[in-house]
Curated annotation (Swiss-Prot):
Required for the differentiation of the dorsal-ventral pattern, and does not appear to be involved in the process of segmentation. This is Protein zerknuellt. InterPro entries: HD, HD_metazoa, Homeobox_CS, Homeodomain-like_sf. It comes from Drosophila subobscura (Fruit fly). Residues 69-83 have a biased composition (Polar residues).
Amino acid sequence: MSSVMHYYPVHHPTAPPVVKYSDLLYGHHHSANLQPTSLQNYTQHSVSSIPEHPSLQQHHHQHHQQQQLSSDENLPSQPSQDMQRVKLKRSRTAFTSVQLVELENEFKSNMYLYRTRRIEIAQRLSLCERQVKIWFQNRRMKFKKDIQGHREAKASAKLAQPQAEQSAHRGIVQRLMSYSQDPREAAASAAEKRPAVAAAPAAPVVAAPPVVAAATSTASFYGQAKIKPQAIPSNNNNSMCSSDLSEILEHLAQSTAXPAATVTPPGPSIGPTCGSTGVSSSGHYSYNVDLVLQSIKQDLEAAAQAWSKSKAGPVLANAQSWHPSGVGSSSVPAVSHATPSMNLSWGEPAAKSRKLSISHINPCVAGGYNYQN
């Protein structure tokens, strides 16, 4: 029977420190200085005196490695806990389309909710009260940002337009608005703004129709001037309007290069439409200037055509009525009048002057006298 000897680590009991007589005489500090060296020598001597077996050394080495591994495993345990904490963070709430529609409708009716209404909406939509509260906060912030962005876009678009173009459009609008005023007030304001109208090259002045000439001759025959003074200044006013029309048309031809997408149909009432478009363009002239100017241009062209037709028609009719072939008739021939436009400064004064000149002619004298003889 072979005897196997097992070596176990030897546990040495620490012996109590020996108090010497010198320590009592010289004090505690002297013994304290000597005690660590004596204990250190004692432990070194005891460890060196006991020879260790190789198996014991291997056992101690494995135990030391296990302790190191356990300490190394404990080190990354803290980041893993942090990752778990990050994963436990609240995820973003994904609202369904039905919930979003209900919340938007509630926001349109009321931007701020009191607590009872918030709880009611949360229960109806199967949401938390906090989720409803946060959604309304975010929606209010988005609403404010949209308003600020819209204002900034308007301001930037207005600043981007050149100052000269803005002043030119304002001048056009003021002219169009002045056409819808009374002709005497418009003429007075034009004379105040432009005192040197006679020096500037104007359109050729149209000669007075034969009706006005005949009226003046009959008035001199009776020795009375019955024609109102508005009949003669109306021609100057019309020439001024025609010159302003030509200037505006030239400016519009230069400023509008691309054709407009929307065209306003020309109608009989041309003056009020021009005034209304001028007022609307004065409010929003910095955005759709091209469209507004194109429509104004077409309205002005239609107005000029109507004005020229209304002026040329009665002249031809009067020339035919005063022809020598119609001397034998005892009654005044019928004169075809064009339908006057709604604009006072373009059509009405000329029409009124023609009516006045015809009404003051004595039918007996007109039928009995032959001016050629």
